[in-house]
Amino acid sequence: MPIWVDADACPLPVKEILYRAAHRAQVVTTLVANQGLRVPPSPYIKTQQVEKGFDVADHVIAQQVIPGDLVITGDIPLASWVIDAGGEALNPRGEIYTRETIQARLGMRNFMEELRSAGVQTGGPAPFNAADKQRFANALDKWLLKGKLS
């Protein structure tokens, strides 16, 4: 039950939670990014640097994920691929993507993309805050506990 992290856009507080959790739960956690990353020394924390390019890290993660893996990503298409592969997806704000919710999220993402393409300014997500950090930590702990019980 390894953890994969779409690390290019992952907030630092989320990475720090993941580092502690990887060590505490002894779960291999691989951060995939198109740039070098500094991570604490640990046999459970790995990095994988990929070529620069649109969605390159997403494709690398999607090709390696297997059922039971957890992927940390805010990228809706990647989350959909992960779910289709039998993995689980959690965004950095603590929202767990499920087979039931991912289609609606994809539809909304595509709709917003169409608006932006038409020149409509849609704004962005709210700044990452302490409540997001806590929701993420709680969701990660729940996933780790579920893994230990199975």
From Swiss-Prot:
Lineage: Bacteria, Pseudomonadati, Pseudomonadota, Gammaproteobacteria, Aeromonadales
Protein name from the UniProt record: UPF0178 protein ASA_3749
Bilayer-crossing regions: none
HAMAP family: UPF0178
InterPro entries assigned to the protein according to its UniProt record, in alphabetical order: UPF0178
Family: Belongs to the UPF0178 family.
Pfam families hit by this protein: DUF188 (PF02639)
Alphabetized CDD domains for the sequence: PIN_YqxD-like
